[in-house]
């Protein structure tokens, strides 16, 4: 089993705190409709562009989403 790129717990926390549906968040970030669910569930890892889009949208660093540091 391979390690996942993102810290799924942190990503779920950010997504839930946003208050919008996962689909709405994806649309605002320019991601595919179910991308966020796939990243949180561990079905797939985000591309670099998707990781940057999520960090920008949530106002955190990419390192935070990767589980490597503070916001």
Show where each model-derived region lies.
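Short, charged recognition helix plus adjacent turn
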Residues: 1, 38, 56, 66-71
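A short, Lys/Arg-rich alpha-helix, primarily the initiator
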Residues: 1-20, 24
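Residues in the recognition helix of alpha-helical DNA-binding motifs
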Residues: 14, 28, 39, 68
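Alpha-helical residues within the helix-turn-helix
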Residues: 16, 27, 56
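Short alpha-helical DNA-recognition segment
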Residues: 19-38
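Residue-level signal for the short linker/turn that defines the boundary of a DNA-recognition helix
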Residues: 19-21, 46-49
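Key DNA-contact positions within bacterial/archaeal DNA-binding proteins
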Residues: 34, 44, 63
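DNA major-groove recognition helix of helix-turn-helix/homeodomain DNA-binding modules
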Residues: 49-64
